[in-house]
Amino acid sequence: MERLKNHREFVAVLKRRRRVSDADIVLHYVVRTPSTPTGAAPARRLGLAVSKSVGNAVVRNTVKRRFRVLAHRYEHELPADCDIVLRAKPGAAHASFQSLEAQIQALFRAVMRKSEQS
């Protein structure tokens, strides 16, 4: 899974206002039209937003590491050309790894379901 690298890419996802949320995570997403050349694999891209309300730098980095691991683990459950931004709510700092895993898996499935409907 590639990364969203600059502010413009984050804003493009956040402006679409398509989101799903759970107790500790809000997932903003946009399914892109396939613009990759033939033969190139479609890319899913991930951005992370963990604000200071989650905790100090150590806590924020721990949350980001967990999000990255879980996003890579369940990326196959997302549409092929999809950009997502995972935004942590303050409760994510105290959530167990298993709880975050269940939430991310459910959110990714919800994105897949919603993208197939539209």
From Swiss-Prot:
Q: Which GO terms describe its molecular function?
A: 3'-tRNA processing endoribonuclease activity; ribonuclease P activity; tRNA binding
> What family is this?
Belongs to the RnpA family.
* Enzyme Commission number(s): 3.1.26.5
Top-tier EC class: hydrolase
Stated name of the protein: Ribonuclease P protein component
Per its UniProt entry, which superkingdom is the organism in?
Bacteria
Role, per record: RNaseP catalyzes the removal of the 5'-leader sequence from pre-tRNA to produce the mature 5'-terminus. It can also cleave other RNA substrates such as 4.5S RNA. The protein component plays an auxiliary but essential role in vivo by binding to the 5'-leader sequence and broadening the substrate specificity of the ribozyme.
Q: Which PANTHER family match?
A: RIBONUCLEASE P PROTEIN COMPONENT
Q: How does it assemble?
A: Consists of a catalytic RNA component (M1 or rnpB) and a protein subunit.
Q: What does the record give as the reaction this protein catalyses?
A: Endonucleolytic cleavage of RNA, removing 5'-extranucleotides from tRNA precursor
Q: Which gene encodes it?
A: rnpA
Q: Which Pfam families match?
A: Ribonuclease_P
Biological process terms in GO annotation: tRNA 5'-leader removal
State the species of origin: Bifidobacterium animalis subsp. lactis (strain AD011)
Kindly state which keywords UniProt assigns to this record, in alphabetical order.
Endonuclease, Hydrolase, Nuclease, RNA-binding, tRNA processing
Q: Supply one GO CC term from the record.
A: ribonuclease P complex
What the entry lists under Gene3D superfamilies is as follows:
3.30.230.10
Q: Is Lipoprotein there in the keyword field?
A: no
